[in-house]
A protein has these predicted regions:
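Bacterial N-terminal signal peptides
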Residues: 10-20
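Hydrophobic beta-strand segments that make up the repeating blades of beta-propeller
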Residues: 62-66, 111-114, 160-163, 208-212, ...
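Blade-level signature of beta-propeller repeat domains, shared across WD40, Kelch, NHL, RCC1
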Residues: 344-379
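Short glycine/acidic-enriched loop and turn motifs that connect beta-strands
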Residues: 68-70, 117-119, 166-168, 213-217, ...
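Beta-strand-rich domains and repeat architectures in extracellular enzymes and scaffolds
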Residues: 41-58, 62, 67
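Beta-propeller blade termini
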Residues: 47-56, 76, 96-105, 125, ...
Length: 379
């Protein structure tokens, strides 16, 4: 065989037809929509990022979970894309994630931290000025991985679902004063580092979807709630895809909560469209980056369709995946190399009052957070 003429004429014609471009041109990547605006130092080993308003000033703030020095870094937003120098606070051993909610019903956001090494979740009651009162710990089972807040028994108080390393999920009911009380334990069939809560079947009872990632029994597992802090037997979707992270967003504007998830099996992302009855479509695959690990959804271009940004742990980058007019995802992705490498966390918000979604990523290796602002005109 002539090695200099590997592709035959029919093969070249097929590839050219596939891409719909003369001369077999490859498709262009997503436009360059972001530019690096700021870099900030945080604690050691940032592994999770949260956008929230800690001090109720209307400006989005950032919280990083720093696993290596068991701390949180609080970055208060100025509203122009910059943030004040991080304030670091020590929490219990090996925190892995943080979420926010009004746990004690005083109208002020509180933080709830999952502390893997201490085997507990910790409530940090907010004062409304960005500071916090004495932590309130709640003991969990062995090696907690993730905490999900929602009102699971319809009493107007936030409850917590905590996933454990050894394939279990514990349900804690909230008493409305910052304290939680254990109620039920469920088998998940697989460890879960990520999950979300929403009413998937329209019965006004909160349900749970978990990214169950153990390779032998991996799937997206959906637990439909009974409205009294108990749940039905889970249903599994996207089996054997090893989902690592799952987020919730209405991706097709039908007012039903859809699921987008990253997997440990290849570099693709997947989406499950909600049918509104508690069930979901077959997984729809689209391209991610090198080692997709964490996700955020926002309007990352002017077309009003929900787009996806993914943190890539293997390629030290994050990738932007925008939508086409027909709802499909653009290929190839636009990739942004992160200075500090080892990107484990990503979040988004309007950090400069531009009316457009911006992106923050955390480098686990160099202990920094990078801010990327959206361009008004794209390259």
């Amino acid at each position: 065989m002539n090695r200099h003429h590997f592709f035959s004429t029919p093969a070249i014609f097929f590839i050219s037809t596939l891409f719909g471009l003369p001369g077999c041109d490859l498709p262009s990547p997503t436009p360059d929509m972001f530019y690096k605006f700021d870099v900030m130092s945080v604690g050691k080993g940032p592994s999770y990022l949260l956008t929230t308003d800690l001090n109720l000033d209307g400006e989005p703030d950032l919280v990083t979970v720093n696993t290596k020095d068991s701390s949180l870094s609080l970055l208060y937003g100025k509203g122009d894309g910059t943030f004040h120098t991080a304030r670091n606070i020590t929490v219990a051993a090996e925190p892995t994630m943080v979420t926010s909610g009004d746990i004690n019903r005083d109208g002020i956001p509180d933080l709830v931290v999952n502390a893997r090494g201490a085997e507990m979740i910790i409530v940090l009651p907010g004062n409304g000025d960005g500071s916090f009162r004495k932590p309130i710990p709640t003991r969990t089972g062995k090696v907690p991985l993730n905490v999900i807040l929602a009102d699971f028994n319809n009493d107007g108080k936030l409850d917590a679902a905590v996933t454990l390393t050894f394939d279990e999920m514990e349900i804690f009911t909230g008493s409305g004063d910052g304290y939680f009380h254990k109620r039920q334990t469920y088998s998940t069939g697989s460890r879960s580092f990520s999950g979300v809560a929403e009413d998937f079947n329209g019965d006004k009872k909160m349900d749970i979807a978990l990214a169950a990632s153990s390779s032998s029994a991996s799937s997206i597992r959906v637990f439909l709630g009974n409205g009294n802090s108990t749940f039905q037997k889970p249903k599994s979707y996207a089996k054997q895809l090893v989902p690592l992270a799952v987020i919730l967003k209405d991706m097709n504007a039908d007012e039903k909560p859809d699921l987008v998830f990253a997997t440990g099996k290849g570099d693709n992302l997947f989406m499950l469209y909600s049918k509104g009855d508690g069930s979901f479509s077959k997984p729809i695959s689209f391209s991610g980056g090198g080692g997709p690990f964490a996700l955020t959804v926002g309007n990352f271009n002017p077309d009003k369709l929900k787009d996806v940004a993914v943190a890539n742990s293997r390629s030290s980058s994050f990738s932007l995946v925008t939508r086409n007019a027909n709802g499909t995802f653009h290929y190839p992705t636009r990739d942004y190399v992160v200075e500090g490498g080892t990107v484990l966390a990503i979040t988004s918000g309007d950090y400069n009052h531009s009316g457009m979604s911006d992106i923050a990523v955390a480098s686990n290796f160099k202990n920094i957070v990078e801010i990327y602002l959206q361009r008004r005109s794209f390259k």
